[in-house]
Amino acid sequence: MFDKQEFVSKLVTEEKAKIVLLVMDGLGDIPVNGKTPLQAANTPNLDSLAKESDLGQTIPVLPGITPGSGPGHLSLFGYDPIRYQIGRGILEALGIGVEVGEKDVVARANFATWDGKVVLDRRAGRPATEESAKVVQLLSEKIKKIEDVEITFYPGKEHRFVVKFTGEGLGDNVTDADPQKEGHPMVWAEGLDEPSKKTARITNELIKKIAEVLKDNPKINFALIRGFSKYPDLPKFPQVYKMKAGAIATYPMYRGLAKLVGMEIIETGQTVADEIKTLKERWNDYDFFYVHVKKTDSYGEDGKFEEKVKVIEEVDALIPEIVSLNPDVLVITGDHSTPVPLKAHSWHPVPLLIWSKYTRRGLSQAFNEFECARGTLGTIHASDVMTLALAYAGKLEKFGA
């Protein structure tokens, strides 16, 4: 089978370059009252940059396939998201520093609100991180083992936490214990092979125990568990692309994904401004920077149009600070689309901007979904973005005589 990443890796040179990949999570959208959030936002800096850039749009997996954030990011990093299928559990776990061993299966979990029949709120009203941490502590005291499997809880951000299952004979080929939509009955975990059936059985029992412990809490009274995974083996980004890579991200899952591919995690603050400040402070320490903005996705999932607009404007105001660093290549895109009307990830193509001194300037007027659809790069697979970034940075040899 043709391995595109391996093919590209053989063409990568030792040439020094600075590349910034700015991922605005869930950036792509569809019009509401005639405009997408990108179109409605006041973005003079992004629009000015677009006039000096090549634009296009990406397909993260395949046309019509709605990607999770894991596949969406793997694609952007140049990995085949179908070949490397990774559960969100390992990403979240690594992102918060969980040690994962050979006997472990980890999963990502949400606190939720449940009325005994249907899931009313998949995120339990997005409780504060501190509040969730107290609930996780309570669960840690009350639930330590199911059958012969040790259960360990780790707090994440807001409604999120991680569960680690440690024991013999556990598999990770388990369906999500999550209906995926509110107002629907619970969908319980199912194992798709014998070891995974054990994991599923213990997971379902665990959720029932959690519900019992939290039965008196009006909002945080249930849990959804998904993204079961063991530790996978992937080619490492620094070796593939011959670049020292640093990740600036506030949310554990994205830190975990970056760590999984071999990037170093750079500590930063909680705001986008903090992240760009960190980028400037650590500019001389890395060749490649991955910078992640989460709230564009969060507000898309919550159906909050104006809030998504404000995050885009917040990022726009910081663009001059990135440009002032004079990177060889600046890529601005999303890992997938999260349209406000859908309140969920979608299959829609994702806007893409590539800025360098080698772009065909003057062909685009603004950065939005429709200008990108008309852009010089066309519609490409997201796994080609990294190849293009390397090319624009002068880090690829010619192929063939």
Curated annotation (Swiss-Prot):
Family matches, as Pfam families: Metalloenzyme (PF01676), PhosphMutase (PF10143)
EC number: 5.4.2.12
BP GO annotations: glycolytic process
Superkingdom to which the source organism belongs: Bacteria
InterPro entries: Alkaline_phosphatase_core_sf (IPR017850), ApgAM_prokaryotes (IPR023665), Metalloenzyme (IPR006124), Pglycerate_mutase_ApgM (IPR004456)
Keyword field: Glycolysis, Isomerase
GO MF terms held by the record: metal ion binding; phosphoglycerate mutase activity
Pathway(s) of this molecule: Carbohydrate degradation; glycolysis; pyruvate from D-glyceraldehyde 3-phosphate: step 3/5
Catalysis: reaction(s): (2R)-2-phosphoglycerate = (2R)-3-phosphoglycerate
Annotated PANTHER family: COFACTOR-INDEPENDENT PHOSPHOGLYCERATE MUTASE (PTHR31209), METALLOENZYME DOMAIN-CONTAINING PROTEIN (PTHR31209:SF0)
Function comment: Catalyzes the interconversion of 2-phosphoglycerate and 3-phosphoglycerate.
HAMAP family assigned to the protein according to its UniProt record, in alphabetical order: ApgM_B
Family from the record: Belongs to the BPG-independent phosphoglycerate mutase family. A-PGAM subfamily.
Protein name stated in the entry: Probable 2,3-bisphosphoglycerate-independent phosphoglycerate mutase
Source organism per UniProt: Thermotoga petrophila (strain ATCC BAA-488 / DSM 13995 / JCM 10881 / RKU-1)
Upper lineage: Bacteria, Thermotogati, Thermotogota, Thermotogae, Thermotogales
